[in-house]
Amino acid sequence: MDIILKIKEAGLVGRGGASFPTATKWETVKNAPGDKKYVVCNASEGEPGVKKDLFIFKNHAERMVDGMKIALDYLGAETGYIYINPSYYNKLARKLNKLIKDTKIILFKKDHRAGYIGGDESALVNHIEGRRIEPRLRPPYIATNGLWNYPTLVNNVETFYNVSLVSAGEYENKRFITIGGDCPNEGVFYFDENWPIEKILRETNNYPKFKFFVRSAAMPVAKF
């Protein structure tokens, strides 16, 4: 079965935060005019406390690279870039460079001064081009006018990991979740996409004994 059909059948959405349908993004880049196309893995991970990309790199880097290769092949892309958090680069460059040897993929170290905003897909495209690291006005969008104004696919580390699973028929609609801060069991966990926060906290033995409410997935719980 064609990879796009597999991705559609799996209902795969991006894991970078927007949950945009992966197949739609890939098809947009595929159908955009341009004699060159590019693929970027966004491994910026600038959100405080979030460590799922690092976990995937340490434990499933081969899968992530495989997902990028699948994207490169589908698009007939010129080059792929792993745009990586500088602290991760220092830990993982040797491992990743070994995995991407003799491929079209290049490891690109994010400037530590780029901060959180450096993870915006248009800002990272500017960075790779050697321009000022700031978001672009949109439209046009990166899918049609990205690196050097060519169609560019930007997906998160976890998205490429999932593409590899989908291709192998092993995708189970799960997601990596970071739990950290003032809790007994910090870590990165892998649970069903549809699990509620209460079930996740109980399953990881992190459910508070006090009354609380969750303000957002990236903020601490509030006591009352």
Question: What annotation goes with each model-predicted range?
Answer:
Residues M1-I133:
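Iron-sulfur-cluster electron-transfer modules
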Residues K25, E78-G80, N205-A218:
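Short loop-to-beta-strand transition segments
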Residues K36-Y38, K174-F176, K211-F212:
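A residue-level signal for beta-strand positions that form part of recognition/binding surfaces
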Residues V65-A71, D192-P208:
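Short amphipathic, charge-patterned alpha-helical segments
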Residues Y89-E193, T204-P208:
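Hydrophobic alpha-helical positions that pack around
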Residues V221-F224:
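Eukaryotic mixed-charge, acidic/polar low-complexity intrinsically disordered regions
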